[in-house]
């Protein structure tokens, strides 16, 4: 449409960078003597929460074990909005990573990309443990350096802002609710 084809995977790299923030969260359950009896790594997947709820509730055979374990988290990109307050000049000169020649490239267009992180748990304590492992890092933002355009060695700091938190405590539907 507008000239030469290019694809630097900038949005893909941004989605991956967001997801990697949450891929090592654990939930522990303690016994009566305060010794850890289980340590669960919280599963993380890209996709809407409704997809996971539907998979949990699709049980034609009520004796079969559920395929999805809780707690789990999902995330998805849900908004892309132009941010005119961060706009700068149209072109800028970058030196190639090998230092041999100058390359002229367009400046990135400033967009805010919205993500939704969903936490799905059976136990309220699991939700509290997960949230407590996330909140301290966002005051209210967390900066992450991402290699956005590797052909010119462009690394940018991406500020991830935590706007709000909501959590779903999952209660299994009764057999009569399943139809």
Listing of model-derived features with the role each one plays in the protein:
Residues 69-71, 109-115, 176:
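Residues at beta-strand starts and edge strands
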Residues 60-65, 99-107, 169:
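Catalytic micro-motifs at enzyme active sites that drive phosphoryl/nucleotidyl and oxygen chemistry
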Residues 94-96:
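Short N-terminal or domain-adjacent regulatory/targeting segments
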Residues 76, 118, 161-163:
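Residues in well-ordered beta-strands of folded domains
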Residues 1-92:
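Small/polar-rich, solvent-exposed N-terminal microdomains that initiate assembly or binding
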Residues 170-179:
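Conserved small/polar residues in nucleotide/adenosyl-binding loops
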Residues 150-169:
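Short, conserved secondary-structure transition motifs
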Residues 1-30, 84-87, 98-154:
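Charged, amphipathic alpha-helical segments and their flanking helix caps
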């Amino acid at each position: 449409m507008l000239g030469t084809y290019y694809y630097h995977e900038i949005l893909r790299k941004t989605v991956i960078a967001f997801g990697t923030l949450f891929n090592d969260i654990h939930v522990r359950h303690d016994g009566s003597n305060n010794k850890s009896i289980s340590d669960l790594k919280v599963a993380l997947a890209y996709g809407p929460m409704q997809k996971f709820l539907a998979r949990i509730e699709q049980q034609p055979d009520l004796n079969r074990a559920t395929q999805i374990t809780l707690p789990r988290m999902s995330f998805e990109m849900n908004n892309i909005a132009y941010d005119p307050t961060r706009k700068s000049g149209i072109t800028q000169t970058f030196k190639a990573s090998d230092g041999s020649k100058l390359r002229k490239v367009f400046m990135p267009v400033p967009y805010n990309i919205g993500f939704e992180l969903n936490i799905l748990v059976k136990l309220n304590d699991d939700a509290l443990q997960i949230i407590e492992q996330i909140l301290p890092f966002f005051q209210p933002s967390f900066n992450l350096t991402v290699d956005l355009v590797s052909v010119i060695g462009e690394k940018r700091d991406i500020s991830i802002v935590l706007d709000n938190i909501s959590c779903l405590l999952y209660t299994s539907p009764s057999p009569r609710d399943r139809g």
